[in-house]
Amino acid sequence: MATTPLAERLRPQHLDDYIGQEHLVGNKGVFRKFFETGNVPSFILWGPPGVGKTTLAKIVASQLDRPFFTLSAVTSGVKDVRDVIESAKRQRFFDQRPPFLFIDEIHRFNKSQQDSLLGAVEQGVFTLIGATTENPSFEVISPLLSRCQVYILKALEDSDLQRLLERALTVDEELKKREIEVVETGALFRFSGGDARKLLNILDIVVGATDGKVVITDKYVTECLQQNIALYDKKAEMTS
């Protein structure tokens, strides 16, 4: 049985496998132009959870073959930012192209933490990629925001979720070992709420609920999730 979550196993490595956000990654999308020219400005990805912000950032770095540093705004401080800046400067001795610095939940950085990024962004020490679920106009300081493009990511539509479901069932080696029949997708998509990661987590739960053939119906999905919530509540009671 696989220990890596389905969402991580299915994380796309190339833009052609990326699902959703056609306004950004379609044939005329700005991210296609990035790959054609190799010129990428610092930018912030703003959108709800599970719509592909982290994945898109990783694809950009991978397809342009540039170093990729990451920080989580939840656990990192000014010292961590300075350490990355020094690492990025050393990297420039070997590669004139600036590395990428990806900061997840950049809205969690306070003013002094965001200030510590300014000089490096301005000097091109690295290309900043921020990800946020909050409006950057309110959460990112003006000097930093003025140096970044902002790209809005939208919740996935049902057609996107359908493509993701089909990809999971045809590509994932663990799921291919199981007999799975999809009869209804209404509950699966409704509970996902346009969140790709949530869809794949629910699919993981539904498939893992039985050792036999999996028949996905609205009723079965609802029952599996109710049982999962009940089990979680019971465990919480035992540990509280």
Question: Residue spans of the language-model regions?
Answer:
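A short, basic N-terminal segment
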Residues: M1-T37
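Walker A/P-loop
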Residues: A2-T4, K33-S72, E86-K89, L118-Q123
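Short glycine-rich substrate-engagement loop in P-loop NTPases that contacts/grips substrate
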Residues: L24-K28, F68-F100, K111
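Conserved AAA+ ATPase "SRH/arginine-finger" region at the nucleotide-binding site
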Residues: S72-V74, Q149-Q162
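Short regulatory helix/loop adjacent to the ATP-binding pocket of P-loop NTPases
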Residues: L118-G119, N135-Q149, E166
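Conserved AAA+ ATPase "sensor/coupling" helix adjacent to the nucleotide-binding pocket
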Residues: R147, D160-K176, I205-G208
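C-terminal helical "lid" of AAA+/P-loop NTPase domains
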Residues: G186-F191, R197-D211, E223
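C-terminal engagement/docking regions of AAA+ P-loop ATPases
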Residues: T217-S240
